[in-house]
């Protein structure tokens, strides 16, 4: 008798699927460009402490608003901080917040969507999805203002734990991403649980949790990955926007949004480098994740792939 798959085999199946997806992405021109950009940004963010950069917090007062040159490749800001090092270190904040927030949203949203889809038509389904609708009905900015108004921007000390404003931001964004991901997972899971193989698994005596993790989840993970990739680009904009208005990453931690906020008064003074480099970093990051997300849709949707091939053939 064949052994029933356990969680490790389900995880292995998901990882194999992700591996195949990455290989397929590299065969798509836009996907390959996006992957290369993301890898480059990630490498810079991870290796920032090892790179021969100037201190992003040091004030070179005698070099304030110095244009890009050999001493400061990206120039300096109005208080003499090196923009190159601050841009690279800002990638650590933006990418780490994006990855952590999306990870929280995926875990919460996928879990809720799976349970609600499996229990479709029951009170559990109604309660979970109504809660998601209520959560999604209030814009993120309102939640952010309320959170800062209640807790402030300082670090909270809860017992032995220190909750920074960045941590609060990650939790807030992650929780608010859950409704959209839950609705996506719910629609996919509700269709999947009606498949014959799920009924066969029930007849074998397999529990609902095991069916969801071992059978349903691997079959619906691809659209969730596409949505998560697109959300990474959205999160970078959200983090930059909140930091721009003072609700996100707090000084002295380098942040692209805070750098753009600091350079507002210099946009029309000729000191273009102060705002152009953090702005370009936001643009390139969002572009990279959108390219990968769009390529993933093409790879995973046969109809889109066929239309892309027909378009390419017509162009030739």
Residue ranges and their predicted role:
Residues 47-51, 101-133, 145:
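Transmembrane-helix boundary motif in ABC transporter permease subunits
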Residues 73, 118, 127-192, 223:
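Generic hydrophobic transmembrane alpha-helix motif, especially the helices
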Residues 152-163, 176, 225, 229-230, ...:
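C-terminal transmembrane helix and the adjacent membrane-cytosol boundary/short C-terminal tail
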Residues 83-115, 285:
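Transmembrane alpha-helix signature in integral membrane proteins
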Residues 76-81, 118-120, 200-217, 260:
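Short helix-to-coil transition segments within interhelical loops
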Residues 4-5, 36, 40-79, 245-254:
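Hydrophobic alpha-helical transmembrane segments of membrane transport/permease proteins
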Residues 2-58, 128-131, 220:
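N-terminal signal-anchor/first transmembrane alpha helix
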